[in-house]
């Protein structure tokens, strides 16, 4: 079990590194990686023009559990929304436009595939 957790952690970290490089190549400016606060963690916070972008990175080595981007369900969206509001307020960036993107990274033996889903979801309210 420890090996599996280590493998998952490695997959996640590699996916985040690849996503950050991909976003920079696409013109995003990375502001934070693995930002943590009392509400949780967000993988990447970046700037795309005048927009602050909160990016969730999902990485998979196989399709056994479905497409990576499908792992960002309502609970995860709620958590990311809370973190984003906290970040914008504490950094005094709440006058900026914000957006939620997902980067899906598929790491397979035949090669890597990175997909950027802009505006993947809206700000989630509730609970």
Curated annotation (Swiss-Prot):
Transmembrane segments: none annotated. GO terms for molecular function: nucleic acid binding. InterPro entries: Restrct_endonuc-II-like, tRNA_endonuc-like_dom_sf, UPF0102_YraN-like. It comes from the Bacteria. Belongs to the UPF0102 family. This is UPF0102 protein SYNAS_23220. It comes from Syntrophus aciditrophicus (strain SB).
């Amino acid at each position: 079990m420890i090996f599996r957790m280590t493998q998952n952690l490695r997959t996640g970290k590699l996916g985040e590194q690849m996503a950050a490089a991909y976003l920079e190549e696409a013109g995003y400016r990375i502001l934070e990686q693995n930002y943590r606060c009392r509400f949780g963690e967000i993988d990447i916070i970046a700037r795309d023009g005048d927009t602050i972008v909160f990016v969730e990175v999902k990485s998979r080595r196989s399709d056994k559990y479905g497409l990576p981007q499908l792992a960002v369900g309502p609970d995860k969206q709620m958590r990311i929304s809370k973190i984003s509001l906290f970040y914008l307020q504490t950094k005094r960036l709440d006058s900026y436009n914000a957006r939620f993107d997902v980067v899906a990274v598929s790491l397979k033996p035949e090669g890597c595939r990175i997909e950027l889903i802009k505006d993947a979801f809206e700000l989630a309210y509730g609970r």
